[in-house]
Amino acid sequence: MENLEKMGVKVFEVDMDSVDEIANASIGVDCVVSTLAGLGDVIIDLQKRVLDGAIKAGVPRFISSDFSSDYNDLVPGENRNFDLRREFKKYIDSTSIKATSVFNGAFADILQYNTPILNLKDKSIGYWGDKADWELDFTTMDDTAAFTAEVALDDNAPRDLQIASFQISPNMILADVKEANESRF
């Protein structure tokens, strides 16, 4: 917090269960950026309180805690995390605030943590069905932060912003791994 304060950022300690405290901390703000992570008690319940506080304070714009793949056209019920975001989206879209969702695909840093898409430990690359050539969106944290900052400053920001630092398919990942690593995948 000290580094933020040195840069001129005003830091407020608030009770996140209190819409009134959130509202008081949001007075005079042009945009609230929600960067929450969690399950229903966070993505829906807590984020609703943050949104309600922003609305009570007269904040005109809100960026929700999406920062994920675009779930709008995905089948409800297939992914819990997308379903939580979809439920919050219904709520925010029923309010008067101008909302933006940033859809950045996956954060690029997951490629270094032995996830199903790239598991260096098990020497495996995963994909669904016949999707080995399907290019996935990945965005770095820095790019996500930069685009989010731009949206926060833009009165005409779109409802949904799609971004990606790069797109890569499982077959492209395999080719890159083979080139960089002599072991077999």
Question: Where are the model-predicted features located?
Answer:
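Cofactor-binding loops of NAD(P)H-dependent oxidoreductases
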Residues: V14
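Short, structured active-site "lid" loops
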Residues: V9
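N-terminal Rossmann-like NAD(P) cofactor-binding module of classical short-chain dehydrogenase/reductase
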Residues: S26-T35, I63
